[in-house]
Curated annotation (Swiss-Prot):
Residues 1-23, 149-280, 356-384 are cytoplasmic. The gene is KCNK18. Residues 323-328 are annotated as: Selectivity filter 2. Homodimer. Heterodimer with KCNK2. Heterodimer with KCNK10. Interacts with calcineurin. Interacts with YWHAH, in a phosphorylation-dependent manner. GO terms for molecular function: calcium-activated potassium channel activity; metal ion binding; outward rectifier potassium channel activity; potassium ion leak channel activity. One of its GO terms (biological process) is cellular response to pH. It comes from Homo sapiens. This is Potassium channel subfamily K member 18. N-glycosylated. Phosphorylation of Ser-264 is required for the binding of 14-3-3eta/YWHAH. Calcineurin-mediated dephosphorylation enhances channel activity. It is found in: Cell membrane. Residues 116-121 are annotated as: Selectivity filter 1. K(+) channel that conducts outward and inward rectifying currents at depolarized and hyperpolarized membrane potentials, respectively. The outward rectifying currents are voltage-dependent, coupled to K(+) electrochemical gradient across the membrane, whereas the inward currents can be induced in response to activation of Ca(2+)-mobilizing receptors. Homo- and heterodimerizes to form functional channels with distinct regulatory and gating properties. It catalyses: K(+)(in) = K(+)(out).
Length: 384
C-alpha cells in the first residue's frame, strides 16, 4: 500500500505547485515592484520644495486677499463675491510646502499608483518624478491586473464551492433562488446512456454492396484472374516500404517533453481568469459579501484613524476598493494602512466579481428585451 501511494503523491505535488506557482510569482513580482518604486520615489521626491510655492504665485494671492479685505464695513457686502471668487483660486500645495517622502509613504504612493486608486494628496512634484510615475504606472497596472485575475480565480472557486454546499441546506429553496439565479443553474442535465444499453445493429444485405454480387460472377477464368490481380495489388500496396526518415519526438504527450511541473505551470497559466468567467451566484449573496467585507475594515480603521467614524471609514473603504479615490478623506497614519494591502487586493477582486455579475445580469435583461421585440410581442401589445 505504501509503494502504490508514492506515484500518486508524485503526480499530485506537481499539479498543486503548478496551480500555486503562477499566483505566487505574480504576487512576488508585485511586491518587489512596489519596494523598488518606494526606494526610487523616496530618493527623488524626499525633501523637495514645491515649485508652485516658489514662483511668487502664493504671495500674489495673499496681496490680493489683503486688498480685498482692506475695506470699510459698508463695502464688505459688495466685495463678498470678489472674495468668494478669489478663494476658489487656492491651491492645496500652498499649505504643504515640503513633501515628506519616507520609505513607507513612498510605498503607499506606489500602491495607489498601480492599484489605480490615486487619492491625490500624495503626488510627485519634480519633473523626473512625474515622468517616472507615468513609466511606473505603465508596467505596474498590468502587473496588478494579473495578480487580481489570478486572485479572482481562487476567490471564484471558493465562492462557487461554498455556494454549492449551502444550496443543499433546506432553507435554500428553489423558488427563493430562482428569483436571482439564471435558469441555467436549474437546468437538469440529461442522464447519460447506460453502459449495457443495446446498440442497434445495422445489417446491409449483399445486394446493396457495390461491385459484382455473390453468385452472379460467371464461372470464367477471366473473372478469377481479375480477382487474383486485385488482391495481389492490394497486398503489395500494404507491404510497401517507406524510405527511412529521421525519428522525431512525438508531441502527443507534452508532459514527457516539458516535465510534469513545467507542463502543469503552463497549462494553469492558460486557464488564468476562466473561473471568474464561469462563476454564477445570486446577486444578493455577493452584495452581502461586499457589504460585510467593507464593514469589517470600517470597524477596524477608526482605531488608529481617530478622526473617522464608522460611516466615514465605510465610505473611504468603498471608494478605495472601487478605485474611485476622490482624495477627500486624508489618512493621518497611512503607514498603518499598508498592512491592509492584501485586504485591498482581495477586496478589489470581490468588487470586480460583483460588477461582473451585475454586467452579466444586465446583458441577460438586454437579450430578453431584444427577444421580446424580435418575436413581435410588443407589436401585438401595441396593436391591442
Amino acid at each position: 500500500m505504501e509503494v502504490s501511494g508514492h506515484p500518486q503523491a508524485r503526480r499530485c505535488c506537481p499539479e498543486a505547485l503548478g496551480k500555486l506557482f503562477p499566483g505566487l510569482c505574480f504576487l512576488c513580482f508585485l511586491v518587489t515592484y512596489a519596494l523598488v518604486g518606494a526606494v526610487v520615489f523616496s530618493a527623488i521626491e524626499d525633501g523637495q520644495v514645491l515649485v508652485a510655492a516658489d514662483d511668487g504665485e502664493f504671495e500674489k494671492f495673499l496681496e490680493e486677499l489683503c486688498r480685498i479685505l482692506n475695506c470699510s464695513e459698508t463695502v464688505v457686502e459688495d466685495r463678498k463675491q470678489d472674495l468668494q471668487g478669489h478663494l476658489q483660486k487656492v491651491k492645496p500645495q500652498w499649505f504643504n510646502r515640503t513633501t515628506h517622502w519616507s520609505f513607507l509613504s513612498s510605498l503607499f504612493f506606489c500602491c495607489t499608483v498601480f492599484s489605480t486608486v490615486g487619492y491625490g494628496y500624495i503626488y510627485p512634484v519634480t519633473r523626473l518624478g512625474k515622468y517616472l510615475c507615468m513609466l511606473y504606472a505603465l508596467f505596474g497596472i498590468p502587473l496588478m491586473f494579473l495578480v487580481l485575475t489570478d486572485t479572482g480565480d481562487i476567490l471564484a472557486t471558493i465562492l462557487s464551492t461554498s455556494y454549492n454546499r449551502f444550496r443543499k441546506f433546506p432553507f435554500f429553496t428553489r423558488p427563493l433562488l430562482s428569483k436571482w439565479c439564471p435558469k441555467s443553474l436549474f437546468k437538469k442535465k440529461p442522464d447519460p446512456k447506460p453502459a449495457d444499453e443495446a446498440v442497434p445493429q445495422i445489417i446491409i444485405s449483399a445486394e446493396e454492396l457495390p461491385g459484382p454480387k455473390l453468385g452472379t460472377c460467371p464461372s470464367r477464368p477471366s473473372c478469377s484472374m481479375e480477382l487474383f490481380e486485385r488482391s495481389h495489388a492490394l497486398e503489395k500496396q500494404n507491404t510497401l516500404q517507406l524510405p527511412p526518415q529521421a525519428m522525431e519526438r512525438s508531441n502527443s504527450c507534452p508532459e514527457l517533453v516539458l516535465g510534469r511541473l513545467s507542463y502543469s505551470i503552463i497549462s494553469n497559466l492558460d486557464e488564468v481568469g476562466q473561473q471568474v468567467e464561469r462563476l454564477d451566484i445570486p446577486l444578493p449573496i455577493i452584495a452581502l459579501i461586499v457589504f460585510a467585507y467593507i464593514s469589517c475594515a470600517a470597524a477596524i480603521l477608526p482605531f488608529w484613524e481617530t478622526q473617522l467614524d464608522f460611516e466615514n471609514a465605510f465610505y473611504f473603504c468603498f471608494v478605495t476598493l472601487t478605485t474611485i479615490g476622490f482624495g477627500d478623506t486624508v489618512l493621518e497614519h497611512p503607514n498603518f494602512f499598508l498592512f491592509f494591502s492584501i485586504y485591498i487586493i482581495v477586496g478589489m477582486e470581490i468588487v470586480f466579481i460583483a460588477f461582473k455579475l451585475v454586467q452579466n445580469r444586465l446583458i441577460d435583461i438586454y437579450k430578453n428585451v431584444m427577444l421580446f421585440f424580435a418575436k413581435g410581442k410588443f407589436y401585438h401589445l401595441v396593436k391591442k
